[in-house]
Amino acid sequence: MEPWLRIWDTSTGQCLRTLVHEDNPPITSVCFAPNGRYVLAFSLDSCLRLWDYVSGTVKKTYSGHKNQGFSIGGCFGSVDGEPFIAAPSEDGEIVLWDVKNKEVVQRISGHQGVCFWVDVYEDIMVSAGQDGKIRVYKHHNPEAAKGINGVAAVNEALGDLMVTDLPLKSEDIKKEIIDLPLKSNDIKIEA
């Protein structure tokens, strides 16, 4: 793990920019914001940094999860048009932040041991953990979730770093009873 991000031009293979934070924390994973202008970096100092890679500056820093020894990664999502950042934590939780004000809006008990990864698609969130399970979460209000387009909502919100003023509530997302055990012999790859 290195303490910098490199932005590459995939058509030429050229490094366009190297981004380094003054604290130099090792970076474990990154993801693009859906609008393509920002990069969210997960680092071993228990912080997420939202980089504007064009200007080379950190626009926001999010703290409130634990990440000091594992490569973990999360994503952007949207509920009822409200964009958020979802990140796993070494204490097994999933932490959700309001993109604009950087506040933790929800903590979800996810896994026994480290939660390694979180991803969101429309009104569904999945997580994978050290306990060998993939957990699936679904927005509890299907009518409100109808037509959610996380890409469009986050794209629109991150364009000028704005989100709606409605906070996420703990009852907005509930755990569905779906725990999928992971075993190496469950995964078959065909050549």
Residue ranges and their predicted role:
Residues 1-19:
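Solenoidal tandem-repeat scaffolds enriched in leucines and small polar residues
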Residues 64-72, 81-83, 90-95, 100-191:
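Terminal intrinsically disordered, low-complexity extensions flanking WD-repeat/beta-propeller proteins
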